[in-house]
């Protein structure tokens, strides 16, 4: 299966579409009785009313989520190929994106993080361009706007602001205009939210929106390890990818090295930002899918022992299906 997607064969588009819904067989066969979809944060709903959410039936929710994942996978695949992050262009990034976006049941339904991943993929594309641009001011401004829009949908997305400055450290010499432009882009959207609260004599509530940033990082975690055994093959692939990346690190183009360092920071921020959400939900980690899928695609793109990597991928797919059905 991996070999099939190493090429840009158009038939792979149909195979990817079928594969997207194959990975949803378990939840389609036994759908939950009710699914709640909160598209915006409560502080945004006061400003913007979008008449969607609980109007979807369970099946419609699952099918629409699958279509969105498929669209994201194609956009993601184009970006990875355009920036030459793998040995050769193909559909491996899309395949791994769909696979990792199917790991857990909360990933298979509509969620704020699913919508935010459109923004995260666009941010990834913008940040991969800054090393090739003579001036990154407008790129950083756009990234700031994307992060602000994501924050209106899902508050932990605000922590992605750190990624702006980490990326500038990686790619460019210090230019205070570039460092400030991302923040200005972010504040240009948040400014309208502040004006709304001001008009309603409610600036105190606007201040409270940002209080979760002061939350202490939890020291104790209650984890049902049986629920996360599906991550074992993913962890093995990640380790193999890191080994592969280390072996090729100094033989790669400088832009490729910096790209994977930036993606590592994105992955880390996506994981750690959960602390800003008091009512933590597993779908938060859907934000880890774009950077994680690049790393997995890198491993399969460079792997040489076909019997091994095909077996490893098959084990992952079977494990996902088993744990979704159980």
How would you label these PLM feature ranges?
Residues 160-184:
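Perimembrane helix-loop-helix junctions
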Residues 139-155, 271:
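Membrane-interface alpha helices of multi-pass inner-membrane proteins
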Residues 246-304:
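Membrane-water interface signatures at transmembrane helix termini and the short loops
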Residues 40-56, 207-228, 241-245:
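Juxtamembrane membrane-water interface segments that cap and precede transmembrane helices
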Residues 90-105, 114-121, 143:
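Membrane-embedded helix bundles of polyisoprenyl
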Residues 123-138:
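Membrane-interface transmembrane helices that cradle and orient dolichyl/undecaprenyl
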Residues 67-83:
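Transmembrane-helix motifs of polytopic, lipid-linked glycan transferases
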Residues 15, 176-196:
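Hydrophobic alpha-helical membrane-interfacial segments at the cytosolic entry of transmembrane helices
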């Amino acid at each position: 299966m991996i070999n099939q997607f190493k090429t840009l064969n158009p038939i792979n588009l149909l195979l990817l579409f079928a594969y997207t819904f194959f990975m949803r067989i378990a939840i389609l066969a036994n759908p939950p009785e009710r699914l709640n979809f909160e598209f915006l944060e409560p502080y945004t709903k006061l400003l913007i009313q979008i008449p969607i959410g609980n109007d979807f039936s369970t099946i419609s929710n699952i099918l629409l989520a699958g279509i969105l994942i498929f669209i994201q996978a194609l956009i993601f695949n184009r970006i990875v190929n355009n920036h030459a992050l793998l040995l050769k262009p193909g559909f491996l990034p899309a395949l791994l994106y769909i696979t990792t976006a199917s790991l857990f049941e909360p990933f298979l339904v509509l969620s704020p993080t699913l919508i935010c991943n459109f923004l995260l993929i666009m941010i990834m594309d913008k940040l991969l361009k800054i090393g090739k641009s003579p001036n990154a001011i407008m790129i950083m401004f756009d990234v700031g706007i994307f992060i602000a829009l994501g924050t209106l949908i899902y508050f932990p997305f605000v922590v992605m602001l750190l990624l702006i400055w980490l990326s500038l450290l990686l790619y460019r010499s210090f230019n205070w205009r570039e460092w400030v432009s991302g923040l200005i882009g972010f504040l240009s959207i948040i400014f309208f939210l502040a004006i709304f609260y001001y008009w309603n004599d409610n600036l105190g509530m606007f201040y409270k929106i940002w209080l979760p940033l002061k939350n202490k990082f939890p020291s104790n975690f209650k984890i049902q390890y049986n629920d996360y055994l599906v991550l074992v093959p993913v962890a093995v692939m990640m380790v193999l990818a890191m080994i592969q990346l280390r072996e090729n690190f100094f033989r790669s183009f400088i832009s490729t090295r910096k790209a994977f360092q930036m993606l590592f920071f994105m992955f880390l921020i996506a994981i750690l930002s959960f602390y800003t959400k008091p009512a933590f939900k597993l779908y938060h980690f859907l934000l880890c899918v774009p950077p994680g899928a690049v790393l997995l695609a890198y491993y399969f793109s460079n792997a040489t022992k076909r019997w091994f990597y095909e077996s490893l991928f098959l084990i992952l797919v079977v494990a996902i299906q088993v744990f979704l059905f159980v």
